[in-house]
Amino acid sequence: MGRIIGIDLGTTNSCVAVLDGDKARVIENAEGDRTTPSIIAYTADETLVGQPAKRQAVTNPTNTVFAIKRLIGRRFKDDEVQRDVDIMPFKIIGADNGDAWVEAQGKKMAPPQISAEILKKMKKTAEDYLGEEVTEAVITVPAYFNDSQRQATKDAGRIAGLEVKRIINEPTAAALAYGIDKKQGDNIVAVYDLGGGTFDISIIEIDSVDGEQTFEVLATNGDTHLGGEDFDNRLINYLADEFKKEQSLDLRNDPLAMQRLKEAAEKAKIELSSTTQTEVNLPYITADATGPKHLVVKITRAKLESLVEDLITRSLEPLKVALADADLSVSDINEVILVGGQTRMPKVREEVSSFFGKELRQDVNPDEAVAIGAAVQAGVLSGDVKDVLLLDVTPLSLGIETMGSVMTKLIEKNTTIPTKASQTFSTADDNQAAVTIHVLQGERKQSSGNKSLGQFNLEGIEPAPRGMPQIEVAFDIDADGILHVSATDKKTGKAQNITIKASSGLSDEEVEAMVRDAEAHADEDAKFEELVTARNQADGMVHATKKQIEEAGEELPADEKEKIEAAMANVDTATKGSDKEAIEKATQELMEASSKLMEIAQAKAQAQQGQPEGAGEAQQDAHAADDVVDAEFEEVKDDKK
């Protein structure tokens, strides 16, 4: 069986880890970074992911997609999505099924399809490190993700060519990373997770009895549309307003300027975590009839804190709810762990520390803890990590719509999963032949105030007065937090079973089509890599041949030199094209044409072997030259990758 990797699929950055012996290890990507920006760019002929996508964002803002996690599993008409429609430089559209999709380079794409590009990058990063194919993963999601968002994340994994062995909640993963090597007794930990686009709070009890550790989630709460992106947007709007006051020009109408502003705001926010003042200086940000305009604004830490004060306060409300749900007070919490890049902001740390009345743990890396925890869970699933039991919960209540548009709950929020529950219902009318089971998720009594997860019909009910037929509805939540529902007519035994896919969401056929599309692109990528390798080998051969011609000097006959130069010209022409076979053929012909050069080089080497003193000097030079050629060839090859 291959290795199972752990992936933190983040809003702003993503991270991949694997169990290395008994320790989880974060894997560096091809650029040498431990985290990868969750940014995807679509150009006319390729898809860029991570740093390469981020670097070109300023010149290609409408086709560069970021924070796609904020859209995954969401409806286009959702208030949160509509807010993003107004501020994102890329185009967010409504799909035929009502989902929020993205349009780039004239192509309409579902969020799972775009997220799959990030997962493919994580998969490749792990494969390069392990030296073997990776087909299985544990992927993390915000604890407060609903069923649609979890299902969409699993779809993204499938499209990326990964079997998602488990969906695990981010705060739970962070607690695993923190607690796996701490074998003390009972410990109640609060995990405050403020990432790029989502916020979660989980209260987790870590028990260690007779060498077995139990991680039990007591309560969870959060906001799936609150994170670092919102903090950035406050600063972006402030800078745009300041510029408008000074220049009477609104940068919000200029996508290129807004992309530069976004990068500058993000950089300024990070700088203000370690300094009390910074300056945003963007020359030539835009221009009008009077000439170019420059943006220069000084920002203090106090100013930034005033801009985001309500966002920080907003994150404290779920803490109170989670504590109440767990039936605990602040004094019952032993440790507080901060996860997510936005928790590096001093004001956030100060407010959380003040809320819990205790010092925060400093030994957890907020960017890597979640991926490490996912790798630990992967180890549990593969049997490499023993004596660890993880008991997670469902974040929201689940039920069905009953008479009077009331939501009747079958499973309460914060119930440990996996779990099952069933309840018997009846018909509302005489001789009713079918019932519609409308599945809901949320805490409101009125059905319309909750998230609709989908509906299905149970037909063929025998005619009977209202209230007589007995229909058993059973809910079954698996370890991923995904819901399976069945309805059975107790008299006839007729049953209808479904795995809940949101009333929106992607069908199996759509996911399969996207998988095939991804596989087709994988073939294209492999062919492109082979082409680059052939070009690099050809360039290396030409470079080495030119050096040998110089070294041969007058010993190389003019007609041979002419033949070799013609072969080199053919190689140059071939490498400008995209025909791998033509490049390889031209390279082979150059090798054959250079046979005279090889003879001269061998004769020189034999002559040098006869020298008793200083024989090594010329030979060393030749070897040094060879080494230079090899090293340069390897470097070019790596660079192209």
From Swiss-Prot:
Q: Decide whether keyword Phosphoprotein is in the record.
A: yes
List the Gene3D superfamilies hit by this protein, alphabetically.
1.20.1270.10, 3.30.420.40, Actin, Chain A, domain 4 (3.90.640.10), Substrate Binding Domain Of DNAk, Chain A, domain 1 (2.60.34.10)
Q: Per its UniProt record, what InterPro entries does this chain match?
A: ATPase_NBD, Chaperone_DnaK, Heat_shock_70_CS, HSP70_C_sf, HSP70_peptide-bd_sf, Hsp_70_fam
Q: Name one Pfam family in it.
A: HSP70
Note down the stretches annotated as region Disordered: 601-641
Modification type Phosphothreonine: residues: 198
Q: Cross-referenced NCBIfam families, in alphabetical order?
A: PRK00290.1 (NF001413), prok_dnaK (TIGR02350)
What is the protein name stated in its UniProt record? Answer: Chaperone protein DnaK
